[in-house]
């Protein structure tokens, strides 16, 4: 069997135990375990989020969010979460409300808030409604035009207060910028503490993490279903890589692919009915399609090369994948029906080593990792072929688009530490999430919640 072009990314300590699978997973070089970037669900330090903003200046919209009336009696500080969300957007800027507490029902002097430098103002309230329930209300104002931009009311339990704050931030983002926010979306990643591996799900800011699965063997390649209810991943619990689908609400797992050899790199079709996977059952790793219940397996690529890391296009008509069929790894595109339906076409031409393709939700951009004095996150315009380098780090890996296509989550090293990071697609805003202890890898940004 041919040796895979991707060098070993597992630590030397675990190299021999996972050598066969490592040769076939199709990950780019230096896929090392990342220092923890997100909080564990229990007993761990909370994630620390640092936001670096450059080159935006006056283009940021200034927003003042007053303290919500009654929130001091609630177990979550909603306004703190809202302000944090707005700040990390890179496109909205917080204006200090000076400690003011204002309910959404108040008669607001918008002129006074404009004089403080705010173009938008947010007021709200949190009211206990019995049996652990809370009523959360808010209203958004345009201080420049002197008018209301609407608001919402929520009846939620204690555990839903945090996501409610994210939804309020999403509302503000959309009303002021004209596009959907992603604060209420979720992240998935794999944590390792000692010899224990955990698949975790967290809020988009790295907080409120929950354990979906714990294993004594590695878990890799989490991939969200389009409806955000399931995550596909690869588990080594059978002493080889096997693909499962995990229902996050029930905890039920479905074995999707346990073919001869290695089963890796699952990617959902846009309709949630199928998964593209990389299998070595017939020799070299090739791309296959399988139904989400594990039935109906079908081979899609038919080359003598290594074909791996498949990704469906948002319209479901194409599959992007990594292949060394030209002598070195590059990104290719083929019809979703496979190479029998049409030949694969090379997509990346800048650089001699390009891997880990991810397509933006609108299908217009390709994020990938190039090897050029290190491993760097790139963004390619699929219309004109223009390529932009989004980071100044040299150990980037595992890119994943936010649901609105405006940000990319990835793993890298900063200041000698391994971290998770997110960068806006214009390169102006960077967020770094770090944790004091533990390892984490393979981040994946979830879809809009339905």
Curated annotation (Swiss-Prot):
Query: In terms of one coarse class, where is the protein primarily found?
Result: periplasm
List keywords of the entry alphabetically. Answer: Cell cycle, Cell division, Periplasm, Signal
Q: Where is the signal peptide?
A: 1-47
Where is this gene product found? Answer: Periplasm
One Pfam family named in its UniProt record: PD40
One cellular component term (GO) for this entry is: periplasmic space
State the source organism's domain of life.
Bacteria
Biological process, per Gene Ontology: cell division; protein import
**Keyword Cell division recorded:** yes
* Keyword Amino-acid biosynthesis appears in the UniProt entry: no
Q: Which InterPro entries match?
A: 6-blade_b-propeller_TolB-like (IPR011042), PD40 (IPR011659), Tol-Pal_TolB (IPR014167), TolB_N (IPR007195)
Q: What does this protein do?
A: Part of the Tol-Pal system, which plays a role in outer membrane invagination during cell division and is important for maintaining outer membrane integrity.
Mind telling me which PANTHER family this protein's record contains?
A: PROTEIN TOLB (PTHR36842:SF1), PROTEIN TOLB HOMOLOG (PTHR36842)
What does the subunit comment say?
Answer: The Tol-Pal system is composed of five core proteins: the inner membrane proteins TolA, TolQ and TolR, the periplasmic protein TolB and the outer membrane protein Pal. They form a network linking the inner and outer membranes and the peptidoglycan layer.
| Membership in a protein family | Belongs to the TolB family.
What's the name of the protein?
Tol-Pal system protein TolB
Q: Which gene encodes it?
A: tolB
């Amino acid at each position: 069997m041919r040796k895979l072009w991707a060098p070993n990314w597992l630590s030397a300590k675990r190299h021999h135990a996972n050598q066969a699978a490592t040769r076939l997973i199709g990950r780019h070089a230096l896929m090392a375990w990342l220092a923890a970037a997100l909080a564990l669900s229990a007993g761990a330090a909370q994630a620390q989020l640092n936001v670096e903003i450059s080159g935006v200046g006056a283009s940021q919209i200034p927003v003042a969010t007053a303290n919500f009336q009654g929130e001091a009696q609630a177990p979550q500080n909603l306004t703190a979460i809202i302000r944090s969300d707005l700040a990390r957007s890179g496109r909205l800027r917080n204006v200090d409300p000076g400690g003011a507490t204002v309910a959404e029902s108040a008669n607001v002097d918008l002129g006074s808030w404009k004089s403080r430098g705010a173009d938008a103002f947010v007021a709200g309230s949190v009211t206990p409604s019995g049996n652990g329930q809370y009523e959360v209300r808010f209203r958004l104002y345009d201080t420049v035009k002197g008018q209301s931009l609407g608001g919402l009311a929520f009846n939620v339990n204690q555990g839903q207060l945090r996501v409610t704050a994210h939804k309020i931030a999403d509302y503000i983002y959309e009303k002021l910028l004209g596009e959907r926010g992603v604060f209420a979306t979720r992240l998935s990643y794999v944590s390792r503490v000692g010899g224990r591996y955990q698949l975790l799900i967290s809020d988009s800011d790295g907080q409120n993490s929950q354990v979906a699965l714990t294993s004594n063997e590695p878990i890799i390649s989490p991939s969200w279903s389009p409806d955000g209810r399931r995550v596909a991943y690869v588990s080594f619990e059978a002493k080889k890589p096997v693909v499962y689908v995990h229902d996050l609400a029930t905890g039920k797992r479905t074995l999707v692919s346990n073919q001869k050899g290695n089963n890796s790199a699952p990617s959902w079709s846009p309709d949630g009915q199928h998964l593209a996977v990389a299998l070595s059952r017939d020799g070299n790793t090739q791309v296959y399609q399988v139904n989400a219940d594990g039935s109906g397996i079908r081979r899609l690529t038919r080359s003598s090369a290594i074909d791996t890391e498949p990704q469906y296009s948002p319209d479901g008509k194409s599959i992007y994948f990594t292949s060394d069929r030209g002598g070195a790894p590059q990104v290719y595109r083929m019809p979703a029906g496979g190479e029998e339906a049409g030949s694969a076409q090379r997509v990346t031409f800048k650089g001699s080593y390009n891997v880990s393709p991810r397509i933006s939700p609108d299908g217009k951009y390709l994020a990938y990792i190039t090897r050029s004095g290190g491993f760097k996150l790139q963004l390619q315009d699929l219309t004109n072929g223009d390529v932009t380098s989004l980071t100044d780090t040299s150990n980037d890996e595992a890119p994943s688009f936010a649901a609105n296509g405006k940000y990319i989550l990835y793993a890298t090293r900063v200041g000698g530490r391994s971290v998770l990071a997110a960068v806006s697609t214009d390169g102006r805003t960077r967020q770094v999430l770090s944790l004091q202890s533990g390892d984490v890898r393979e981040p994946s940004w979830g879809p809009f919640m339905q």
